[in-house]
Amino acid sequence: MKVYYENDADLNLLKDKTVAIIGYGSQGHAHAQNLRDSGVKVVVGQRPGGANYELAKEHGFEPVSAAEAAAQADLIMILLPDQVQAEVYKNDIAPNLKSGDVLAFGHGFNIHFEQIAPPADVDVIMAAPKGPGHLVRRTYTEGGAVPAIIAVDQDASGKAFDIALAYAKGIGATRSGVLQTTFREETETDLFGEQAVLCGGLSELIKAGFETLVEAGYQPEIAYFECLHECKLIIDLIYEGGLAKMRDSISDTAEYGDLTRGPRVINDKSREEMKKILKEIQQGEFAREFIAENMTGKAHFSAMRRIGKEHQIEQVGGELRKMMSWLKK
C-alpha cells in the first residue's frame, strides 16, 4: 500500500477555498485549528449554546449556523454524529451547496449507506485521522502528526483525490503518512472493529470474566482488578508494539495461558459470529437497524444503556477508582 507524505500533497489547492467545519466536537476542534494554523481559511458551523460553541469562541473562531457556514464555504467537512448528519445535510447544507463545492466526511457511514446523496457536480471525499481529536491537535502543535486515511466517493472536478490529500496535509497528517481507502472499506471495517473487537467484543469479554469470578465466590473488587483494571496495562503494550511486544513483556505463565487458553475463549463459534456480524454490516442490516432505532425515539437503545450502567462492575469500579489518585476526576 502506498503511503503519501508531505511532498505528495499540494496545500495550495486549499489556499483559495474557505473550509467549513460542521461540528466543533472531538475531531472538529482539531481539524479547524490545524487547518487555520496551516494557512487555510476556516469557518466553524456550530449551533449556539453548549460547551462546543463556547470552546470554538475560546479558540478564536466566530461560530455560525451550519447553513451559514455551508453558504460561505467551498469545502464542507461534516464532523457531526452519524445519526444527525443526514438531517443537517438535508436542512442546512444541501440548500447551500454550489456546483464545484467539495463535501467531506470523517467517516463514511452516511455516504456508504445512502443516507446522504450529494448532487453529481460536487466532489465527495473523506479525510479521517486515526486518532482522537486531542491527539491530532497536540501532535500537530509539537511538529508531528497522527496518520490519516483518505478516500474519494465522487470526483466531479477531476481533482478530488488531490484535494483530499491537501486537506490531510492541512491537518498535519502527511507528516506521519496518509493511506488511501474507499468509503465502503472504511465504513465496514470501522463498524466491524467497533462491534466485534474494540467495544462490543471487549465489553462483553470483560463482563463475562468478571461475572465468572464473582459467581465462583471471588470478591468483586479482585475480579474488577483482574478483568477490567489491568486491561490498560495490556492494551498499552499492544498499542506500542503489537501482540509480540505484549507477549515479550508479560510473564511466561501469562504468555503460556494466553497461547493455550485464549483460543478456547475466542473459538470457531466466536469466529462464525464475527462473520455473521460482518455480513450484517455489509448487507446494510446494522445500518437499517441503527437508523430505525434513532427514528423511533431510541427506547431500546436507552434501555440497554441503563442496564449497562446498572451492572455490578460499574458500582464496584466507581468505588475502586476513588482510590486511584492518578485518575482525572
UniProtKB/Swiss-Prot annotation:
It holds the Pfam family KARI_N. Mg(2+) 2 binds at residues 190, 226, 230. Residues 182-327 form the KARI C-terminal knotted domain. Coiled coil: none annotated. Keywords: Amino-acid biosynthesis, Branched-chain amino acid biosynthesis, Magnesium, Metal-binding, NADP, Oxidoreductase. It catalyses: (2R)-2,3-dihydroxy-3-methylbutanoate + NADP(+) = (2S)-2-acetolactate + NADPH + H(+); (2R,3R)-2,3-dihydroxy-3-methylpentanoate + NADP(+) = (S)-2-ethyl-2-hydroxy-3-oxobutanoate + NADPH + H(+). Involved in the biosynthesis of branched-chain amino acids (BCAA). Catalyzes an alkyl-migration followed by a ketol-acid reduction of (S)-2-acetolactate (S2AL) to yield (R)-2,3-dihydroxy-isovalerate. In the isomerase reaction, S2AL is rearranged via a Mg-dependent methyl migration to produce 3-hydroxy-3-methyl-2-ketobutyrate (HMKB). In the reductase reaction, this 2-ketoacid undergoes a metal-dependent reduction by NADPH to yield (R)-2,3-dihydroxy-isovalerate. Belongs to the ketol-acid reductoisomerase family. This is Ketol-acid reductoisomerase (NADP(+)).
